[in-house]
C-alpha cells in the first residue's frame, strides 16, 4: 500500500506531467490532457482544479464550431509569476526576468560581480530590488544561475557542491533559495533556451554547439541536458580534428577549439582590428568551416540528433558565415534527413541568459520519474 509520502510524490509528479503537456502544446482541453498524459479524467479534473486555485493555469474559454458540449481550453497562466535568470561571466552578473510565456519583464543593467561574499551579495541585492520593482508584484517562481564553465553536477539548492562551487553559490542561496534555485553551465542553459523558445522547440533530442571565447556544447535527450558522470558532457571543443593540428590547452593537438574559438580567430586579425564581416580572414573561415563539418559528421553518427543548433556568444553574422562556408556536411546517418542539418540560433548572444530564466520554468514543468523514488524527508 502506498504511504502518504509516496502518494504526495505521485501527485506532484502527475502535476508536472500536466504542466509539461501544457508548456509543449499550448492550450489543451481536459479530454486532450487525459489522452496525452495517460491520467484518468477524474485525475485531470482534480489536478486542473488545484492548478487553477494556485493561479498556475487558467481557462481560456470554450471552443466553438464543434459538435456536442464545447470543450474548455486550459493554458499555463503567463502572469502566474516570474522566473529570474542570472548569467555570471567576465566579472559581470547579467539578469533577466520573464513571465511563464517567456516574455521579458525586466532586464536591468549588468552589475560587477567580483570581490568577496559581501560585495557579491550587495550586487545581487541591487539586481533583486530592480527586478522586483519591474515585476509589478508578481511572485518569483524560481531562479536560474548560469556560469561559463563546466559544473561538477547539475546544482540545486539542496544538492551537494564541491567546495569552490559551494562558496560561489552562497550569495545566491542567501537571497533566492526560498524558491527553486538551479545552477547550470552556459552551453546547457543556451540549449534549454532553444528547447523552450527557439529552433529546438518541439524537438527533445538535439545537440547544441556553443561558440564563444571557447567552444562548448550540450547534449539534450528527451528534453533534458546530459551532464555525464562528472558534469563535463558536451565538451565538443575537444573533439579531435587533426592530431597534427595546433596545441590545445587540454594537452592534445588539433582540437575543434583551436579552429573555432574566438580567442584563436583574433590571432588572424591585425592588431586592434575589430571583428566584423569585412575584416573576417578568409583563411580562418576556410579552416573553421572545414573543422566544423568534420565535427558535425562525427556528432551526427554518434547521437543521431533531431537537430543541431549553432549558437553562443559569437556574433550571429559569424555563425551564418560559418554555416554558409561549410555547406552541407559530409555523409552521416542524417545525410538523407529532410531537416536542415545545422541551424543557427535566432536568440542571439543573450542565449545563455534567456536559458537561465527558462531553467526554473523547466524545473516547475518537467516530470522527472526519479522524484517518485525519493526517500521521505525526516523532520526534526
Question: Each PLM stretch: what is its role?
Answer:
Residues 186, 212, 356:
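Active-site glycine-centered loops adjacent to acidic/histidine catalytic or metal-binding residues
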Residues 24-25, 197, 212:
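Short helix-capping/turn signature of helix-turn-helix
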Residues 1-60, 66-111, 115-130, 136-139, ...:
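ATP-binding/phosphotransfer module of carbohydrate and carboxylate kinases, centering on a glycine-rich
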Residues 63, 148-151, 212-214, 314-315:
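Short glycine-rich anion-binding loops that position phosphate/pyrophosphate groups of nucleotides
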Residues 203-259:
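Glycine-rich phosphate-binding loop of actin/hexokinase-like ATP-binding domains
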Residues 104-205, 319-332:
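Glycine-rich phosphate-binding loop and adjoining helix at the ATP-binding site
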Residues 168-172, 226-228, 234-241, 326-336:
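Acidic-glycine-rich active-site phosphate/pyrophosphate-binding loop
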Residues 73, 83-87, 140-146, 206-210, ...:
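Short glycine-aspartate micro-motif
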Amino acid at each position: 500500500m502506498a504511504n502518504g509520502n509516496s502518494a504526495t510524490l505521485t501527485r506532484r509528479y502527475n502535476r508536472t506531467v500536466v504542466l509539461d503537456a501544457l508548456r509543449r502544446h499550448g492550450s489543451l482541453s481536459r479530454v486532450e490532457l487525459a489522452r496525452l498524459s495517460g491520467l484518468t479524467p477524474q485525475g485531470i479534473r482534480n489536478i486542473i482544479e488545484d492548478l487553477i486555485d494556485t493561479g498556475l493555469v487558467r481557462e481560456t474559454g470554450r471552443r466553438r464550431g464543434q459538435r456536442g458540449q464545447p470543450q474548455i481550453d486550459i493554458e499555463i497562466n503567463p502572469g502566474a509569476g516570474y522566473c529570474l535568470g542570472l548569467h555570471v561571466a567576465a566579472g559581470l552578473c547579467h539578469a533577466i526576468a520573464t513571465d511563464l510565456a517567456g516574455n521579458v519583464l525586466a532586464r536591468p543593467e549588468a552589475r560587477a560581480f567580483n570581490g568577496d561574499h559581501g560585495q557579491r551579495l550587495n550586487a545581487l541585492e541591487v539586481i533583486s530590488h530592480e527586478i522586483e520593482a519591474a515585476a509589478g508584484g508578481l511572485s518569483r517562481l524560481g531562479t536560474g544561475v548560469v556560469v561559463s564553465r563546466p559544473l561538477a553536477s547539475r546544482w540545486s539548492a539542496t544538492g551537494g557542491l564541491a567546495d569552490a562551487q559551494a562558496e560561489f553559490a552562497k550569495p545566491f542561496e542567501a537571497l533566492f533559495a526560498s524558491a527553486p534555485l538551479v545552477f547550470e553551465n552556459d552551453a546547457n542553459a543556451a540549449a534549454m533556451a532553444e528547447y523552450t523558445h527557439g529552433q529546438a522547440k518541439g524537438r527533445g533530442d538535439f545537440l547544441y554547439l556553443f561558440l564563444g571565447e571557447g567552444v562548448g556544447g550540450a547534449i539534450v535527450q528527451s528534453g533534458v541536458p546530459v551532464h555525464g558522470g562528472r558534469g563535463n558532457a558536451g565538451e565538443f571543443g575537444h573533439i579531435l580534428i587533426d592530431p597534427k593540428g595546433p596545441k590545445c590547452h587540454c594537452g592534445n593537438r588539433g582540437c575543434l577549439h583551436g579552429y573555432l574559438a574566438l580567442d584563436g580567430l583574433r590571432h588572424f586579425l591585425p592588431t586592434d582590428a575589430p571583428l566584423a564581416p569585412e575584416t573576417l580572414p578568409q583563411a580562418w573561415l576556410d579552416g573553421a568551416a572545414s573543422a566544423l563539418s568534420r565535427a558535425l559528421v562525427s556528432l551526427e553518427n554518434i547521437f543521431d540528433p533531431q537537430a543541431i543548433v549553432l549558437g553562443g556568444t559569437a556574433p550571429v553574422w559569424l555563425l551564418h558565415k560559418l554555416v554558409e562556408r561549410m555547406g552541407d556536411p559530409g555523409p552521416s546517418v542524417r545525410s538523407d534527413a529532410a531537416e536542415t542539418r545545422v541551424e543557427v540560433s535566432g536568440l542571439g548572444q543573450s542565449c545563455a541568459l534567456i536559458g537561465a530564466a527558462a531553467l526554473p520554468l523547466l524545473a516547475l514543468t518537467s516530470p522527472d520519474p526519479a522524484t517518485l523514488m525519493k526517500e521521505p524527508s525526516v523532520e526534526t
